[in-house]
């Protein structure tokens, strides 16, 4: 089950009341990219793509956490009965089915970590998981970013960027460009899209 677009926007607005920050605009940009790419692919549910892109970071509602936001989003969406969104909250950070490539602090309890590991290991990724992984990498708070520039920025901030994750993001870009037969930055309106307000 999925929330409607308006329900999803309300969830983000409510989340920003608890934890204001640029994550809300990042989510809007990810949703924009997901909608545009899904539409250009032709065989994806555009509304579903938008909603999943919008809510992938909803765990940020519960405060400033790194790996913790994955757990928080997963549990929160499960509690509302939005299992497809819960899955995306979990999978968007793990391109290669492993938490070893997570960039950021492991600020979770042992129990939370076990749940994340167990759920990631048994999850079968689909086109929407892959799409949101790509869109997470494309989305800045102010607009659409160049993927390599974004990964380099993360590498500078954290001191590393796992090569497997880097390669996976570039492969996702190539894959979806092949599906669309178009340049990803043109489809996502990189040079013209400006993230609005929620």
Regions found by a protein language model. Give the residues of each.
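His-Asp-centered metal-binding catalytic motifs of divalent-metal-dependent phosphohydrolases/nucleases
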Residues: 30, 46-82, 86-97
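Acidic-glycine-rich active-site phosphate/pyrophosphate-binding loop
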Residues: 2-8, 48
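A short small-residue
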Residues: 8-16
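Divalent metal-dependent phosphate-bond-processing catalytic cores, especially two-metal-ion Mg2+/Mn2+ enzymes
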Residues: 3, 16-43, 55, 80, ...
């Amino acid at each position: 089950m999925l929330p409607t677009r308006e329900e999803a926007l309300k969830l983000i607005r409510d989340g920003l009341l608890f934890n204001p920050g640029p994550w809300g605009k990042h989510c809007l940009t990810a949703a924009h990219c997901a909608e545009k790419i899904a539409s250009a692919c032709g065989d994806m549910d555009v509304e579903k793509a938008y909603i999943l892109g919008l809510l992938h970071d909803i765990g940020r509602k519960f405060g400033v956490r790194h790996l913790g936001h994955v757990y928080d989003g997963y549990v929160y969406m499960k509690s509302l009965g939005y299992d497809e969104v819960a899955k995306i909250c979990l999978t968007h950070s793990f391109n290669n089915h492993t938490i070893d490539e997570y960039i950021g602090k492991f600020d979770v309890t042992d129990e939370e970590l076990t749940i994340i590991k167990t759920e990631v290991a048994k999850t079968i990724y689909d086109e929407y998981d892959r799409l949101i992984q790509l869109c997470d990498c494309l989305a800045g708070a102010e607009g659409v970013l160049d993927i390599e520039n974004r990964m380099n920025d993360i590498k500078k901030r954290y001191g590393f960027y796992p090569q497997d994750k880097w390669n996976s993001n570039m492969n996702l870009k190539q894959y979806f460009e092949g599906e669309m037969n178009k340049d990803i930055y043109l489809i996502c309106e990189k040079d013209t899209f400006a993230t609005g307000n929620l």
